[in-house]
UniProtKB/Swiss-Prot annotation:
Keywords: Isomerase, tRNA processing
NCBIfam families to which the protein is assigned, alphabetical: TruB (TIGR00431)
CDD domains, alphabetized: PseudoU_synth_EcTruB, PUA_TruB_bacterial
Protein name as annotated: tRNA pseudouridine synthase B
Organism from which the protein derives: Chromohalobacter salexigens (strain ATCC BAA-138 / DSM 3043 / CIP 106854 / NCIMB 13768 / 1H11)
Residues in the signal sequence: none
Alphabetized PANTHER family for the sequence: PSEUDOURIDYLATE SYNTHASE TRUB1, TRNA-PSEUDOURIDINE SYNTHASE
Assigned protein family: Belongs to the pseudouridine synthase TruB family. Type 1 subfamily.
HAMAP family (alphabetical): TruB_bact
Entry's EC annotation: 5.4.99.25
EC category name: isomerase
Active-site residues (renumbered): D47 (nucleophile)
GO biological process: mRNA pseudouridine synthesis; tRNA pseudouridine synthesis
Matching Gene3D superfamilies: Pseudouridine synthase, PUA domain
Length: 307
């Protein structure tokens, strides 16, 4: 007999404003306990020092979390010049001191220009990437060093917000896998004085923006119904995908794992689309070569909407 899952079957997405000093996993577990949710997962780790947008998926939403993991992100960070730390941020130990040359806004902008577009980054040792099954940060804490291959990432936009004698503030929109700590270190190297970040805040992840976030402390002050009202529908994660409407007969075929003939609205073969029945989200389908659709990832609750 299968063991019954503990907790409440809740579906949806919570936009959490992660507090500083809390790991992403700890923040996830705090929220999961607060909602007494059966199943929950986050969609992209933030460093403990970092704050800001951490989308948390509950229940059926966890099926689609990869779409947010792969999404572009936007961050705001303060870059301190003249000091290099072993972690790339203010939580690490300073391992290099350099005098900071007299820099004006034009000097900084000239350096930033070399880091827009496709760039190569060597991931930091203090990261969750794994080597032989172990996170790199564990090896780093043991004083071990592992050679890491450079990875290609994309900085779509990088704006200089303000600058002072000892540092400057940036807003960066980038592809998945971009390490802002490494970006700051590389910019500091280009300026000839080294650098690390002293603050990092995520402002956007995929379709979600910071103005819709909720702090954990604010959620604690709400009753259960008000907390649940803060959850966004599952399909808000997928607004970048086209949508298709399906009739009851076709939806039943799809829910039984079969292909169905529907109006695919001219979508190309192998396209992924959101599927709806009477405005109720059923999941994702793939357009086949012959104009049919095949089930890709459907909600367990979709059968209720198709009846």
């Amino acid at each position: 007999m299968a063991r019954r899952r503990r907790g409440t079957p809740i579906d949806g997405v919570l936009l959490l404003d992660k507090a500083p000093g809390v790991s992403s996993n700890r923040a996830l577990q705090q929220v999961r306990r607060l909602y007494d949710a059966q199943k929950a997962g986050h969609t992209g780790t933030l460093d403990p020092m970092a704050t800001g947008l951490l989308p948390v998926c509950f229940g059926e939403a966890t099926k689609f979390s990869a779409y947010l993991l792969d999404a572009d992100k936007t961050y705001r960070t303060w870059v301190r010049l003249g000091e290099v730390t072993d972690t790339g941020d203010a939580e690490g130990t300073v391992i290099e001191h350099h005098s900071v040359p007299a820099l004006d806004e034009r000097d900084i902008e000239a350096a930033l220009a070399g880091f827009r577009g496709e760039v190569e980054q060597v991931p930091p040792m203090y990261s969750a990437l794994k080597h032989q099954g172990r996170p790199l940060y564990e090896l780093a804490r043991e004083g071990k060093h592992v050679e890491r291959a450079a990875r290609r990432v994309t900085v779509y936009d990088m704006r200089l917000l303000s600058c002072e004698a000892e540092g400057f503030e940036l807003e960066v929109r980038c592809s998945k896998g971009t390490y802002i700590r490494t970006l700051a270190e590389d910019i500091g190297h280009a300026l000839g004085c080294g650098a690390h970040i002293t603050s990092l805040r995520r402002l956007r992840s995929g379709p979600f923006e910071a103005d819709a976030m909720h702090a954990f402390s604010a959620l604690e002050d709400l009753d259960a119904a008000s907390r649940e009202a803060r959850l966004l529908p599952v399909d808000t994660m997928l607004t970048h995908l086209p949508s298709l409407e399906v009739a009851a007969s076709a939806s039943r075929r799809l829910l039984h794992g079969q292909r169905a003939q529907i109006d695919t609205a001219g979508l190309a073969a192998q396209s992924t689309a959101r599927l709806y029945r009477d405005a109720a989200f059923l999941g994702l389908v793939t357009v086949t070569e012959c104009g049919e659709v095949a089930p890709r990832r459907l909600l367990n609750t979709a059968s209720l909407a198709s009846e």
